[in-house]
Amino acid sequence: GMGIGINLPPCIKNGEYCNPWTGSIILGGACCGTCTDYECH
């Protein structure tokens, strides 16, 4: 890798809570799939 120095958190698994406006309750987190109805799918 390029070694920029930014470690992104792992993606949020399906079935776990997510916020469609911020992506998730974990800063920088994102669903492995898509976030709909406040749940990762």
From Swiss-Prot:
Tissue: Expressed by the venom duct.
Sorted UniProt keywords: Disulfide bond, Knottin, Secreted, Toxin
Main location: secreted
Domain of life: Eukaryota
GO molecular function: toxin activity
Coiled-coil regions listed in the entry: none
Cellular-component GO terms for this entry: extracellular region
Domain notes: The presence of a 'disulfide through disulfide knot' structurally defines this protein as a knottin.
Official protein name in the record: Augerpeptide hhe6.1
